[in-house]
């Protein structure tokens, strides 16, 4: 299920983005400050390049590139 980022409270969205950009495997040795990485992710959401996907089975949210989301989920 896609979650529209603009419907989330500002703090909730920020916490979600911080969680995503600090997950193991997302920094790839990048020494970019946390606030810059969060803003990059936020900008990708605003441009429509990324989406927030909620998996009800695992109760987890993922930030994904729109191009990587299965087409059937984008139609919902």
Curated annotation (Swiss-Prot):
The record, for InterPro entries, names:
UPF0270, YehU-like_sf
Pfam families according to UniProt: UPF0270
Name the protein family.
Answer: Belongs to the UPF0270 family.
Please report the name of this protein according to its UniProt entry.
Answer: UPF0270 protein PA3463
* Source organism of this protein record: Pseudomonas aeruginosa (strain ATCC 15692 / DSM 22644 / CIP 104116 / JCM 14847 / LMG 12228 / 1C / PRS 101 / PAO1)
